[in-house]
C-alpha cells in the first residue's frame, strides 16, 4: 500500500500488473503486454490510451528479499522510455546479478518502519547516484527551507521527513 500511496501523493494514478510466481515481483512480460495494449508513444513519451495521462515510471517492489527480474524490467523501461524506481524495503542486502537491489533504477527506496528488516521506528532512505536528484530530495524532505542563518524562507512546498535524533 505504501508504494501505491507514494504515487498518489504525487498526484499520479498507480496502475497494477501481475507478478511473477518465482520472485513475487512485477512480471516484465505482464508489464510489457499491459503497456503494448494500453499506451502509445508520442514524441518518445508514453501515454495511456484510456486516460490520456503520461506514464512516467515503474516501481517494482522486491518482496521478502527476492529481487524482481530487473534485467527484464530494465528492458521494458528502456523500450517504453520509463524511469525505473525500486522499492527495495524488503530486500535490503539482497543481490541481483552482483549488484544490490535498490541501485538499478534512478531511485531506490528503503523504509525503516517498525516492521522492516532494519528499523529505527520510522523514517527511510532514498538511494540514487544522481547528485541533482539527491539535492532536490534533501531539499524537499527538510521542509524546502533555503539555508540561511536566521531567516525561514521556503521556496516550495516541502515535507518534514527528517529522522529524529532518537532514531
Task: Please tell me what each predicted stretch does.
Residues 1-63, 67-79, 83-88, 95:
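PLP-dependent aminotransferase-like
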Residues 91-97, 104-167:
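Active-site region of PLP-dependent enzymes
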Residues 2-8, 14-16, 41, 69-71, ...:
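Residue-level detector of solvent-exposed, low-hydrophobicity positions
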Residues 33-35, 100-104:
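Short, hinge-like loop/turn segments at secondary-structure boundaries
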Amino acid at each position: 500500500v505504501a508504494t501505491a500511496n507514494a504515487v498518489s501523493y504525487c498526484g499520479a494514478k498507480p496502475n497494477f500488473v501481475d507478478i511473477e510466481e518465482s520472485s513475487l515481483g512485477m512480471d516484465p512480460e505482464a508489464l510489457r503486454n499491459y503497456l503494448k495494449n494500453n499506451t502509445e508513444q508520442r514524441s518518445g513519451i508514453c501515454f495511456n490510451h484510456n486516460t490520456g495521462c503520461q506514464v512516467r515510471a515503474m516501481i517494482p517492489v522486491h518482496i521478502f528479499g527476492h529481487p524482481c527480474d530487473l534485467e527484464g524490467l530494465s528492458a521494458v523501461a528502456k523500450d517504453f522510455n520509463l524511469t525505473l524506481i525500486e522499492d527495495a524495503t524488503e530486500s535490503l542486502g539482497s543481490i541481483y546479478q552482483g549488484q544490490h537491489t535498490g541501485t538499478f533504477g534512478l531511485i531506490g527506496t528503503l523504509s525503516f518502519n517498525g516492521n522492516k528488516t532494519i528499523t529505527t521506528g520510522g523514517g527511510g532512505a532514498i538511494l540514487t547516484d544522481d547528485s541533482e536528484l539527491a539535492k532536490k530530495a534533501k531539499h524537499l524532505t527538510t521542509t524546502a527551507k533555503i539555508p540561511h542563518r536566521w531567516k525561514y524562507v521556503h521556496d516550495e512546498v516541502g515535507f518534514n521527513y527528517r529522522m529524529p535524533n532518537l532514531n
